[in-house]
Regions:
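Short helix/strand-bridging catalytic loops that position acidic/His residues to coordinate divalent metals
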Residues: 129-138
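Solenoidal tandem-repeat scaffolds enriched in leucines and small polar residues
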Residues: 137-143, 156
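Domain-scale signature associated with acetyltransferase and cell-envelope carbohydrate enzymes
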Residues: 1-121, 145-147, 164, 180, ...
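Beta-rich strand-turn-strand
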Residues: 154-164, 174-175
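Short-chain dehydrogenase/reductase
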Residues: 167, 183-185
Length: 263
């Protein structure tokens, strides 16, 4: 195993590489246990703390640029897995990310993560069906759209897919698709409000001290959208189907009804 305490350009004899034009030398731990793993860091990235482990081979971590406070991640990347962190992603506390078995965890741009959060595309251990011997908890991709707010202690599990502009409530658990511009809460998380938009300015830190309506803030217009109803959208896309009336069946039913009523 190779352990590094700085994030800078690096390459070893096992094909593990780090491409980082900017050096990060504080609160950094990178462990390579396999080969052909790679870290790609944008020149304008801002990293507050990173504990990164590549357990196997062919893993990838991509860290995008950020003009905001340095993020804090504990990341595990397994065989053939990928973790992507978009532009201006922030964390209040430490966020754990786990991706193994070829899956991808992708965080879009301007994602705001609170504290005590976990993003797990796998369960860490295999569960099998006793009769068939087949695995029942496969790892699955996790996708977080742009400008998503993940509340404190919320957890995203395998299969989570969150649309742009949405809010995940405190302590919620997401393991399915959540539409854009909604508030989703609970375990498992369910949509409780649609057609919402949120903005980063803190209620107390940023003026004005009262924000009763949108006139008090500067809108991030690209994320002020109506929620797309997936079921309605799918229905409008379905072609009309012509169903021929089953005349024979109708006639036989009428004849039978006539016999019963004595008509």
């Amino acid at each position: 195993m190779i352990e590094l305490t700085a994030l800078r350009d690096f390459k070893d004899e096992h094909g593990n590489t780090i491409n980082s034009a900017t050096e990060f030398t504080t609160n950094i731990t990178v462990k390579f246990r396999g080969q052909n793993n790679r870290v790609l860091v944008d020149p304008e990235a801002n990293i507050g703390r990173l504990d990164l482990v590549f357990d196997c081979d062919n893993g990838t971590l991509i860290i995008g640029p950020s003009s905001k406070k340095g993020s804090n991640f504990n990341i595990r990347v397994g065989e053939d897995a990928t973790v992507r962190i978009g532009k201006d992603v922030t964390t209040t506390g430490r966020c754990l990310i786990s991706a193994v078995e070829g899956v991808t965890v992708s965080l879009g741009d301007d994602v705001m993560i609170a504290s005590g959060n976990q993003i797990r595309a796998d369960d860490g251990h295999a569960i099998f069906d006793v009769k068939s011997g087949k695995r029942v908890n496969p790892a699955k991709d996790i996708t977080v759209g742009n400008h998503v707010w993940i509340g404190a202690q919320a957890t995203l599990l395998a299969g989570a897919k969150i649309g742009d502009g949405s809010v995940i409530g405190f302590g919620s658990l997401v393991n399915r698709k959540i539409s854009n511009n909604v508030i989703a809460v609970g375990s498992p998380a369910k949509v409780v409000r649609k057609n919402i938009a949120w903005e980063r300015p803190h209620l107390s830190y940023h003026k004005p001290p009262y924000k009763p309506d949108a006139s008090a803030i500067t809108k991030t217009e690209e994320y002020w959208n109506y929620t797309v109803n997936e079921h309605e959208h799918a229905a409008t896309q379905m072609p009309a189907v012509q169903i021929a009336e089953p005349q024979g069946l109708v006639q036989r039913a009428a004849q039978k009804l006539g016999k019963i009523t004595g008509a």
